């Protein structure tokens, strides 16, 4: 089984003046989370979707799933206190319902510009190498600074990548490291890749696209709108 685990547990504090969590903001009468879910719904290799949602909005999400005919979502469950805990909750639900050898693609509900090719590459990488993290090369230079804002090192861009999503693993492996982290009282994982590498797993790079952005601010939302408008214009005018 190939299962998408979609994290929609944030409340979007960086979205100024918004009364909705960022995943429920609408573009052309369609919420961001639905744009995201449609990509996995339409991918022929995805068998099921589990969504971890901020709890007060679960009923609203279920209404959206019905309205937009999203049929692959099998379960919507409440998130935890942190992103790490929310992902763990979702993984435990997948464990209850699916095989331990399932491939799990962990993706942000506010990353709607994912495409079929990236989804398929993630699945193939897990089956070939046991893991996958979607990345793209940086276009600017990273510098390492100290506590006094003095540059201490300049990273080689050719050896750097921007971490994106999906981040994909066998269910048995990602659950194992989450449980180990809980035993160790480790709660500071930035994402699934950082948790896997902390506990000694190699994570294989998968090529992504720069427009696969995470919508966390008003600027991100306007970039998303511009990309959607461009895609629509290309379909109409060629």
Curated annotation (Swiss-Prot):
One of its GO terms (cellular component) is cytosol. It catalyses: D-ribitol 5-phosphate + CTP + H(+) = CDP-L-ribitol + diphosphate. Gene3D superfamilies: Spore Coat Polysaccharide Biosynthesis Protein SpsA, Chain A. CTP binds at residues 7-10, 80-86. Pfam families: IspD. The keyword Membrane does not apply. InterPro entries: IspD/TarI, ISPD_synthase_CS, Nucleotide-diphossugar_trans, TarI. This is Ribitol-5-phosphate cytidylyltransferase. The lineage of its organism: Bacteria, Pseudomonadati, Pseudomonadota, Gammaproteobacteria, Vibrionales.
